[in-house]
Amino acid sequence: MGWPLATPSGPVLALAGAKGGPALTIDNGVMRMTSAVSRFIRGAAIALWLCCGSSMAAEGLLWFDGARPGPQASQAVELLAAAATHGLEPEDYNASALGQAITDAAQGSALEAAVIARLEQALTTAMERYLKDVHQGRIDPRLIHHNFNPRHPEAFDAAAYLQAALVARRLPEAAAEAAPRLPLYEHLREALASYRERVDHPAWRQPLPPLPDGQPGKAGKLEQGQAYAGLSMLAERLVALGDLAPAVPLPSSYEGPLVGAVQAFQQRHGLTPDGVIGKTTLAQLQVTPAARVRQIELTLERLRWTPLMLGPRMIVINIPEFVLRAYEVRDGRIHVQQEMRVVVGKALDTRTPLFDEDMRFIEFSPYWNVPPSIARAEIVPRLRRDPGYFAREGLEFVAPDGRVDRTLTAARLDAVLAGQWRIRQRPGPKNALGDIKFMFPNRDNIYLHHTPATQLFESDRRDFSHGCIRVEQPVSLAKFVLNSMPEWTEDRIRQAMSRGESATLLLSEPVPVLIAYGTTLVKEGQTYFFEDIYGLDRLLDAALRKRAPHPPSIN
């Protein structure tokens, strides 16, 4: 989902991948667009296929050299057998049966033409499906995410891609280039392999025991210096996860390196690293490696959907992480220019939607036009109970023709409920949008904005809004967005924010904004996991399990 950009040493966000367009290769942090490879694979190689008279073309065979499978057939079945390293299911492509059939064909008696034709068709169908799945994912995101339709530069023709790769005799390379060409994707594949190795680890043979002072229906708490019956199990689990060194002696109580290991674990799971094991930390410690494997697989699937950073700048908000990152490409390298905490929509009823749009303007000292749903459910009832709230919060009524009325009456409240008037909040220190909002027009009317409620950024879980996204560092974000407009210095930005008069500024260059959802990421060699706050991983998991595999038949 943009997600997914990184610097050599900076964080890699689990949220984007190349889709359809020129491959993006990053070696040691250097970004290169392999458009020449893309053009060759999709154009020139097809011309070669059609006119160069190779034995492959002449006989109409892709995988066989006469009666025996060629080397690329072996490469293909190896790729299919290794599909699990991408979080895919090898048997979706009939990998075992095809692998055995190719082995038998290579070692046994010569096959009849009809058998060869069936194997050719089955292997071609399997490889086309594999390339399509590894390139753009198995599920259309629009089937499970309202209005999410990420932009893709061009369609992916798996059949043409495969044929061109075979003619060029570079099938393994072409298959690798079909996957998202970003560091995070490869880092997550490594994490996937690591967590698969832990699936049968004895550290999870039974759950950790209840915490000290726990009561029926109430969780306890483990703090430094306390005794705990599960101390050895806890240490074993932290060693298995890499948060505790294996040679550390087990203390008699919860203290020392064990507390430090729990803090490292908490840091990797989006929790306050205070070393105190409460209900939430215990719940994360109980999650099995098998569940983490599935979480990584789902994140890899999301990476295959998400749009590539095609321009010089991009903003990505990762909802489960509650973090915004602003990226810039300079000298062929991707740099994280800004990273800040955000507040997103409440999981229960006002979730922030996923989408991909362009930021086009900024509003300084904005009015807050109260959405009708909030006016009906919250503001009008509050004003009936507490009329003084109207003046204290700087509210006013606005008619359809733009007339403004700052007098609170029962008739005006009735008119708001009837949809005849609306409520807005004037610019000022109490304005719910703060001093600035960042606009990227979209059907859900979602935007980024400042907030006077800065204390919310201190929470681990930050889903408090009505859907829009509150940013922790609005001035820094404005400086990034206005980078192409040097006349907008930090001083000028601050003046516009504090003037108290609403003003709109059009951007000279739109900035892509991606609101993404990734519950796993890798940064600085560590794998991080975040709570599935909106249940979207569960939704994706169910959709993938319902998806009929339809493996290609070889009979």
Model-flagged regions — what are they?
Residues 9, 35-38, 54:
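Serine residues within intrinsically disordered or low-complexity segments
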